[in-house]
């Protein structure tokens, strides 16, 4: 069965680029522009993985993630300390922390590992 991924990022270029990359890998990909948009689409889309930027306008990500029942991997453009990463990874459904800018091959490798 084909896995579905939701990309949640307020940057249209990031959403578009990651969507194209993952679709070429055979995944079904849907997008959301922020946490609120993500929450409104979750019931309908039922993704196997949510790739979510940690810095977006709207409801803070730390309040959105607990409402997501599926696996979540954070995408971060900001430099974060190990303590900050540990804090972000506290939610039981958070499975990875991917630093932006990311290497395309590494992103694909991480996604495949998470969804294996």
For each feature predicted by the language model, list its residue ranges:
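Conserved sequence signature across two-component system core domains
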Residues: 8-9, 32, 50
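Conserved acidic segment of CheY-like receiver
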Residues: 2-12, 18
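Charged docking surfaces used in two-component/phosphorelay signaling
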Residues: 16-24
């Amino acid at each position: 069965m084909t896995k579905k991924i939701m990309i949640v990022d307020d940057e249209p270029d990031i959403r578009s680029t990651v969507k194209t990359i993952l679709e070429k890998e055979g995944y079904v990909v849907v997008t959301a522009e922020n946490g609120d948009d993500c929450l409104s689409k979750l019931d309908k889309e039922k993704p196997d993985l949510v790739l979510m930027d940690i810095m977006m306008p709207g409801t803070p990500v730390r309040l959105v993630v607990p409402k997501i029942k599926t696996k979540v991997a954070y995408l971060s453009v900001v430099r974060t300390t190990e303590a900050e990463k540990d804090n972000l990874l506290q939610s039981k459904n958070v499975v990875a922390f991917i630093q932006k800018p990311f290497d395309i091959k590494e992103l694909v490798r991480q996604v495949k590992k998470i969804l294996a």
